[in-house]
Amino acid sequence: MSHPPLPPQSERRALAIAQAVYEAFEDYHARFSEITARAKQRFETRDWSGAREDAVARIALYDQYIAECMLRLRAVLLGQAHDRALWMRARDHYAALLSGLIDQELYKTFYNTLTRRYFGTHGVDADIEFIALDIEPTDAITVPVARHTYAVSPGRLTDMLVRVLGDYAFAVPYTHRTRCAAAIAVRLLDDLAHWGEHPVRSVELLETVFYRERRAYLVGRVFGEHRFSPCVIALINDEAGLRAEAVLTRRSDVAQLFSNSRSYFQADLSTVGDAVVFLRSLLTHKPVDELYTMLGRAKQGKTERYRTFFSHFQAHPSEQLVHADGTPGMVMVVFTLPSYPLVFKLIRDRFAYPKTMSRAQVEGKYELVFQLDRIGRLLDAQPYRFLRFPKARFSPALLQELQTSCAMSLSEDGDDVLIALCYVQRRLRPLNLYLREQLPEAAHAAALDYGQAIKDMARNNIFPGDMLLKNFGITRHQRAVFYDYDELCLITECNFRDWPVPTTYEEQMAAEPWFHVGPRDVFPERFALFMGLPASQLEAVKHQHPELFDPRWWRDLQSRLREDDYPDTPPYAESRRLA
């Protein structure tokens, strides 16, 4: 909806605001692309440390360019930063500048971020923000994303794949391109044999290569006569050279590759919305917000998550927000809408003993997670500020606890409750509940994967701090994921010690340590006491992952990490690797 024109001088100022914001986003986008484009060279030169630095730098870009834009606007606003009529007209001019753009939603989110900084918006402000809770923006995108398409003649699949690898060339050669192509062909034919004779009729792959950690991915689809499946070819460049390492055709495997418990891809896409539309065809159950986020557009992911949640929230007016299942936390109050798979986490005003950290330290831990390689074991946690909920939508028990335990984060505005800061995560089944609910075989597998999760995190310089089962959840693909970050720290910051051997009867019977324990001291031999696993599952974890309880393993790993020697953690099962 357009607003009436302003007097000529104000109208010119509104147009200047729109142009300045548009140019600021263009500058941000160019810098984002510049960093992302470096991923190819990082992969070719095996510069994994540089790749990690780029990932952190790219996340920080958004707020940097918002701050820079606000500085630019000072000369335009001339003291009228809070003139609502001026911003309403600026929004109209800005919308006109975006006409026809595939990624106009990204531009709108940038604009909204600015107005919220200027006006301190609580909830949403439909007069000056771009708000569309009732539409799915990607539905309007009909332009196909850039891709390569390859037809396959009967018996010529390997030849076609040789051509594919040639089209995706790098500064380093494939160690044996034909052998790689043949291995990919064998895997495709094995995976798709149930499609009948000549199962692979064509393959299409996005022109843009996806990079993350130590791998490059060719992402696309494989078509049979009557159906299609995802097709992701994973490339690795290590001491043995550049080669294809895995092929993923199962949606569950590809979904895990795009899981929101992993770090964001580096994919230098000229436009993003059309790529999201394509990826949705591969991962039909993956929410749009997670796809934007996994492509590095975390702010747009937050916008889409807000849009879809509140659209659902408004469509279910009789459903109340309630405490999430699981053991109540000492640091957070966690609530959910039962029919929607998100949780909202608020920091308590005071923490129960033995928690000793401050509120600022907790916020710092959640910020730290964005800077880490999350390797499929740390759940994305997005901060939201000044969310507005009708007070009547909270269950009485939840509202009472929020008012008494989270007063610093809570305020009331008429019939609404405003939440100054909360962290929003995908809702998972807490591991302690899952183990009680499942049959022995499934519980055994989950316990072993819990041990593997701790090991995977450790190999990427992440120590969970609190290993209790309640701090882990199980995804729909039966993976153990850590989601409670108030005690998380880096492996390189810890002091892994042997548990001293008692020398007297009093020491042997002491309920507390009889020796000095520093704030960073960790005793792996005692982990079993703090995991909370039933005896049979604990023994299975000890048998499968004995190194977790060995201080020497942790110290050796710590030495490697301090030398920037990070062990490789593949994002798929060993069975998916090529012969």
From Swiss-Prot:
Catalytic activity reads: L-seryl-[isocitrate dehydrogenase] + ATP = O-phospho-L-seryl-[isocitrate dehydrogenase] + ADP + H(+)
* E.C. number: 2.7.11.5, 3.1.3.-
Main localisation? cytoplasm
**Record carries keyword Transcription regulation:** no
> Which InterPro entries does the UniProt record give?
AceK_kinase, AceK_regulatory, Isocitrate_DH_AceK
Q: Which GO terms describe its biological process?
A: glucose metabolic process; glyoxylate cycle; tricarboxylic acid cycle
**Is Transmembrane helix among this UniProt entry's keywords?**
no
Q: Which domain of life is it from?
A: Bacteria
Catalytic residues in the record: 380
- GO CC annotation terms, alphabetical: cytoplasm
Q: Which residues bind ATP?
A: 324-330, 345
This entry's Gene Ontology molecular function terms read: [isocitrate dehydrogenase (NADP+)] kinase activity; AMP binding; ATP binding; phosphoprotein phosphatase activity; protein serine/threonine kinase activity
Query: One Pfam family this chain carries?
Result: AceK_kinase
Q: Where is the protein localized?
A: Cytoplasm
Keyword annotations: ATP-binding, Cytoplasm, Glyoxylate bypass, Hydrolase, Kinase, Nucleotide-binding, Protein phosphatase, Serine/threonine-protein kinase, Transferase, Tricarboxylic acid cycle
> Which family does the record assign?
Belongs to the AceK family.
Function according to Swiss-Prot or TrEMBL: Bifunctional enzyme which can phosphorylate or dephosphorylate isocitrate dehydrogenase (IDH) on a specific serine residue. This is a regulatory mechanism which enables bacteria to bypass the Krebs cycle via the glyoxylate shunt in response to the source of carbon. When bacteria are grown on glucose, IDH is fully active and unphosphorylated, but when grown on acetate or ethanol, the activity of IDH declines drastically concomitant with its phosphorylation.
Name-wise, this protein is Isocitrate dehydrogenase kinase/phosphatase
Q: Which organism is it from?
A: Xanthomonas euvesicatoria pv. vesicatoria (strain 85-10) (Xanthomonas campestris pv. vesicatoria)
